[in-house]
């Protein structure tokens, strides 16, 4: 798997593509977590189930790095770090054109499509 950017005995960091889901949902689409479990099972020739804990998620339309725990102990420790705000997350936006301002706030509404389990930005009335 060429999307892995970091792996040790405790953690694995993977590049998530836009459109993928991190964990299973009602759509039935194959989640990234299952792909990583399969990779670990094959790489380490593990019999039975493979533990993989989701430390955080990214929304379906978002691409970026997702961190998974390979052990329950590392999952617990990472959850504690996130809970206590010891981890800093940074988001970057890719835009078609250069924004007019360096900083700003976007105010819009989200409309949920229950069937697709997706949300879309809608115009304010």
Residue ranges and their predicted role:
Residues 1-125:
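RNA pseudouridine synthases
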């Amino acid at each position: 798997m060429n999307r892995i950017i970091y792996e040790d005995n405790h953690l694995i960091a993977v590049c998530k593509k836009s459109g993928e889901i991190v964990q299973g949902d009602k759509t039935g689409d194959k989640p990234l977590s299952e792909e990583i479990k399969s990779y670990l099972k094959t790489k380490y020739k593990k019999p039975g189930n493979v533990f993989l804990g989701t430390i955080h998620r990214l929304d379906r339309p978002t691409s970026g790095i997702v961190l998974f725990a390979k052990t329950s102990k590392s999952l617990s420790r990472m959850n504690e770090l996130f809970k206590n705000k010891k981890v800093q997350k940074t988001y970057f936006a890719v835009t078609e054109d250069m924004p007019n301002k360096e900083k700003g706030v976007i105010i819009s509404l989200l409309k949920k499509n229950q069937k697709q389990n997706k949300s879309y930005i809608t115009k304010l009335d």
